[in-house]
């Protein structure tokens, strides 16, 4: 069994009573409690605090509460001591997930993905991280004799940055620990510590009012369109559904539009190039309308026409184009309905990729889906690209 511990003391230097400050009409701690309660891997959620107000709010959210002694709620109190105190009362769990409430953009999906990495390995700990600038590896330190040494390796200061290893920083969002090993060695860095990589947006930590405003704006991300195209059977519906699920956790104004369903709504009558093009124009118009009304639209459609790409780029202000690429040989193997085999035999007409030519877009992001392996990784990578793209100006 797994327990989540959320530490939430009353004191704060940057923002007064930070854990209860309102972020889009909800207390800051709400987002971490929500993520923990919605997680599939967590069986118990505990809030540890010295504040009666915080504990009262946590209790109203149907989670366990633990009054923390004042000596464990000081500016210099370390997180390991807070966790040790909590585990004195909750020893009958195998693993603990430590979730700081200052990471409101960390969702239950992040937690579950991190726990999956942890459980599918021999790790006794996991720390969520974000990639950081590796130029620190080119720095020097001075030893007690006054001699310069490379901070990590004497070769690194003289290596091209492209050849330096990647560097990561803990983002404070997720810590997973074997309780047995943590009690034996009270440290978040254990003998076998894995990492869970999060993008810079999801890693944002609330430390001051500027951080709060930035996250507030991100949670209110204005309307945009993620246009996901590809041939029938390429996997665009599966990928778009996975992307929608991840975006919906953070941005409630997200909707998923599937081309097949939209054709029913628009009373689509045929599959010739002209009829497909007309249908695609209607879909584009709908996406544009929704985006202008602050809706995040994920649209999965074949619509592989240069006219549509140009239309979208010229009429949709916040537009991100994705192409799911898959070779015809693989599409034929996946062809359970016999669409491609029938078209190649001349039994079926108006099939895009066979007798209807299509244009591969010069998309913002191309997914090679020639293999169905690593689908979750492909969706995660797409999610990161989309989120960073639409928040780059914030």
From Swiss-Prot:
Pathway of action: Capsule biogenesis; capsule polysaccharide biosynthesis
EC numbers on record: 2.7.7.43
The reaction(s) this protein catalyses: an N-acylneuraminate + CTP = a CMP-N-acyl-beta-neuraminate + diphosphate; N-acetylneuraminate + CTP = CMP-N-acetyl-beta-neuraminate + diphosphate
Coiled coil: none
Keyword flag Phosphoprotein: no
Top EC class, one word: transferase
Top-level taxon in the UniProt lineage: Bacteria
Disulfide bridge map: none
Function: Nucleotidyltransferase involved in the biosynthesis of capsular polysaccharides. Catalyzes the condensation of N-acetylneuraminate (Neu5Ac) and CTP to form CMP-N-acetyl-neuraminate (CMP-Neu5Ac).
Protein name (Swiss-Prot/TrEMBL): N-acylneuraminate cytidylyltransferase
Gene: HS6.5
